[in-house]
């Protein structure tokens, strides 16, 4: 998960391709791409000339500083997951993060492990997984997320899709049963599910816990609702990151206050989900209403930490609104009429693919052109 910095009406600070701002390997100052470009050197010493269109925003914040700040905001979420699911939550998060770090260290650029991006990817991937998933699957998902979600595109700032969600999509396709088996909440925080220790590619044998359906699964397939208070505090079944919605909102508000997060994207997502679900509920009361749709599943985690990835989200503010509205609308459609109970992952990945087109359509007119003069007239 990478975050962005708002920049007025023109756009926000990016790491896409890292042309606007590149932190040198020796820890030196940021290099800003000017109107005609800014020269620099890669970690291997090869001279580079970075070219990028405006806006060019100067900031004292380095990439590692932003990344590790985001990691710090995930600590309360991880603590809540551990409280509800026991030590298995920490093991799953550690396995996913380890997979990310090993591939980053082996195949990534020298020194890239220290920027914190691989740690964020591993933690966010782990938060999308059930607590009882075998650890080797979580590790494999982390390796896939970095290898095929980030490095194959050229590394940090070059990827098209959110790496954590791409890793989750891979696990969903490869191991659908494990990804849709939700263990019951742990009776104590020291609990470890036996299924975590299953050997690779072998049957885990008997499961030592009773499984439970997620609130979305109960609503979609059994037409049973879940108490809104339980949804708010996270006392329900689901992925690790589905149990700390209130904490995620608080942490997201802090990131927005620090201007490390483009608040327009989550606000647009929540607005779209609330508006469409409320409208459909008014037309057909048997469908879930806006409060349930907002609090259930991974919507809050996806809106705050996944969709706001600066590399895979639009540059302009108008584009951010369009991006967020699209995610919210698609999420509701998949939840109500799709084959799966949850649609946040696929909606974000789908809108990731449209980001270049959104950027092109909402790009501000070049200063001095006829279109720009009409806008300022």
At which residue positions do the language-model features occur?
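Loop-to-transmembrane alpha-helix initiation sites
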Residues: 160, 164-165, 290-298, 320-322, ...
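Membrane-interface helix-loop-helix junctions at boundaries between adjacent transmembrane segments
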Residues: 117-118, 123-194
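Hydrophobic alpha-helical segments embedded in the membrane of multi-pass proteins
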Residues: 72-74, 98, 116-124, 139, ...
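Membrane-helix cytosolic exit motif
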Residues: 338-371
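Long hydrophobic alpha-helical segments that form multi-pass transmembrane helix bundles
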Residues: 163-248
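C-terminal ends of transmembrane helices
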Residues: 100-111, 146-157, 250-259, 304-313
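Structural signature of hydrophobic alpha-helical transmembrane segments
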Residues: 85-98, 132-141, 235-245, 287-299
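N-terminal signal-anchor module of multipass membrane proteins
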Residues: 2-104, 371, 375-377
């Amino acid at each position: 998960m990478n975050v962005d910095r708002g920049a007025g009406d023109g756009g926000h600070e990016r790491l896409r391709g890292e042309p606007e701002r590149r932190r040198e390997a020796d820890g030196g100052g940021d290099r800003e791409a000017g109107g005609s470009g800014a020269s620099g050197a890669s970690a291997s010493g090869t001279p580079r000339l970075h070219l990028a269109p405006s806006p060019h925003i100067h900031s004292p914040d380095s990439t590692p500083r932003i990344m590790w700040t985001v990691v710090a905001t995930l600590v309360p979420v991880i603590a809540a997951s551990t409280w509800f699911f026991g030590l298995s939550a920490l093991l799953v998060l550690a396995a996913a993060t380890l997979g990310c770090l090993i591939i980053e260290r082996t195949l990534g650029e020298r020194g890239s492990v220290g920027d914190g991006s691989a740690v964020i990817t591993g933690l966010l991937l782990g938060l999308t997984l059930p607590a009882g998933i075998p650890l080797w699957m979580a590790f494999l998902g982390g390796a896939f997320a970095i290898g095929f979600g980030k490095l194959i595109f050229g590394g940090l700032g070059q990827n098209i899709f959110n790496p954590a969600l791409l890793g989750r999509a891979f696990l969903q396709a490869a191991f659908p049963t494990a990804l849709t088996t939700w263990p019951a909440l742990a009776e104590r925080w020291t609990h470890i599910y036996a299924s975590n220790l299953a050997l690779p590619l072998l049957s885990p044998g008997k499961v030592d816990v009773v499984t439970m359906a997620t609130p979305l699964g109960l609503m979609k397939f059994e037409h049973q609702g879940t108490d809104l208070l339980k949804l708010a505090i996270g006392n329900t079944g689901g992925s690790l990151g589905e149990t700390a919605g209130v904490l995620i909102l608080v942490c997201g508000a802090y990131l927005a206050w620090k201007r490390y997060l483009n608040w327009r994207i989550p606000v647009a997502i929540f607005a779209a989900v609330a508006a469409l679900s409320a409208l459909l509920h008014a037309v057909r009361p048997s469908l879930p209403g806006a409060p349930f749709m907002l609090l259930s599943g991974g919507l809050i985690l996806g809106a705050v930490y996944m969709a706001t990835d600066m590399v895979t989200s639009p540059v302009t503010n108008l584009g951010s609104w369009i991006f967020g509205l699209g995610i919210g609308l698609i999420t509701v459609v998949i939840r109500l009429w799709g084959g799966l109970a949850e649609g946040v992952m696929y909606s974000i990945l789908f809108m990731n693919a449209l980001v270049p087109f959104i950027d092109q359509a909402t790009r501000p007119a070049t200063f001095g052109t006829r279109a720009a003069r009409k806008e300022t007239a």
